[in-house]
Regions:
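Structural preference for solvent-exposed beta-strand-turn elements
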Residues: 1-383
Length: 383
């Protein structure tokens, strides 16, 4: 096996494939990258057994400066391969596998030898034989993920909550996530495949998969999504991302969302984010990481304290106030992340009482649940 390629192109593709590789894997060969050389191009593969990324580098694309002398396959240690290729002196490299699986990498006057493993020993990626292909615009998909990923749980006790629940039906994509302390929902329009008209698809995609996918796709690219019983495949041009789906029936979260309120405020999201970040300086030093929001017709106060450090109190500027006076306590990190998910928009926050979850929606779409964040308050003495 032997090929020559433009080094900078190879580095970029190696970096993307390495996103799927975990140093904590219990399967030694999965710490490596599989390189398969065909007559028409090269396939790079990385996997942690949950996520797999495969990239095809075509010989026909002249920008790759790819020439193939001999076909074959090899698995090379991911970390060393990446470090070596990044440091090579010239923007052209040659990689050659010898009979004993010794791999020689040459660039300019530099020569590296790496021990490899036969490509045939690398696990085979799943076959995705899907009835339908869903096309998702990259910019829209990234907004959906960025809005919902914040409520994905990092606790493996409830694996289902470590992902985002997707419902594709009725010409729309609905994405929901919750860690039982907060909830995020985003609904966007979707052109359904002809063969899926009148049908609904519900899947649970791991949060890690979605995070890596947003790093691979550009705003102006489309994502093709194909689903089987327990696998999903995302295709972006020459990049293929395979992922296992999370098993289980996601709970009905619609019942948690209501437009009812006793207190409603409208705020500049960015201004409130900055105020919360100032309060975080002290709240992060306390045992419970709690801040309190006090609302009335006269004023709005955000406060927090650490018994060891001190106290912070800031008067807020509201765009509008409606309803009853209220004092409510909550995790400030949750509010900061929720507000950030709306970008620069003004946000409407609805409160029922100090012990009831409160809901954030954009002011321009406040009476719909197309873009929602829900936060559960923290009970404090007096609440």
């Amino acid at each position: 096996m032997k090929f020559t390629i433009k080094r900078s192109i190879f580095v970029d593709h190696l970096n993307n494939v390495q996103r799927a590789i975990s140093s904590r894997t219990t399967i030694p060969i999965l710490t490596g990258i599989k390189i398969a050389v065909l007559d028409s191009g090269i396939i790079l593969t990385g996997s942690d057994s949950t996520i797999s990324i495969e990239i095809y580098i075509s010989k026909e694309d002249e920008s790759n400066q790819l020439s193939i002398a001999e076909t074959g396959s090899i698995v090379l240690p991911s970390r060393f391969l990446g470090d070596i290729v990044k440091k090579l002196p010239e923007d052209q490299l040659t990689l050659e596998v010898q009979d004993n699986l010794q791999t020689v990498i040459r660039s300019g006057e530099s020569v590296f030898n790496l021990n490899g493993t036969a490509g045939s020993e690398y696990p085979t990626l799943p076959e995705i034989d899907a009835d339908s292909t869903y096309v998702l615009p990259g910019h829209l998909f990234k907004r959906v993920v960025n809005h919902t990923i914040i409520s994905v749980s990092n606790q493996q006790i409830r694996p289902l909550f470590t992902g985002v629940h997707f419902i594709l039906a009725d010409e729309q994509l609905k994405a929901v996530s919750t860690d039982s302390h907060r909830l995020s929902q985003r609904i966007v329009p979707l052109t359904m495949p002809e063969e899926s008209q009148g049908k609904a698809l519900e899947i649970n995609i791991p949060g890690q998969t979605l995070t890596e996918l947003t790093r691979l796709v550009d705003d102006n690219e489309d994502i093709e999504m194909m689903v089987t019983d327990n696998q999903v495949l995302f295709k972006i041009d020459n990049v293929y991302l395979y992922s296992r789906l999370l098993e289980g029936n996601y709970p009905d979260t619609d019942r948690l969302l209501s437009l009812d309120y006793n207190t409603k405020i409208k705020v500049d999201a960015q201004e409130l984010v900055h105020a919360v970040e100032r309060a975080l300086i002290l709240s992060h030093q306390g045992k419970n990481n709690v801040v309190k929001l006090s609302l009335s017709q006269e004023e709005a106060i955000l406060s927090g304290h650490s018994s060891e450090i001190g106290y912070v109190k800031e008067k807020l500027s509201l765009l509008s106030f409606e309803g009853d006076d209220l004092e409510i306590s909550f995790n400030p990190d949750y509010l900061r992340e929720a507000l950030r998910s709306f970008g620069g928009q003004d946000v409407v926050i609805r409160f029922v009482n100090p012990t009831h979850s409160f809901i954030l929606t954009p002011s321009e779409d406040e009476d719909e649940f197309n873009m929602v964040q829900l936060i559960t308050p923290i009970r404090t003495p007096g609440n």
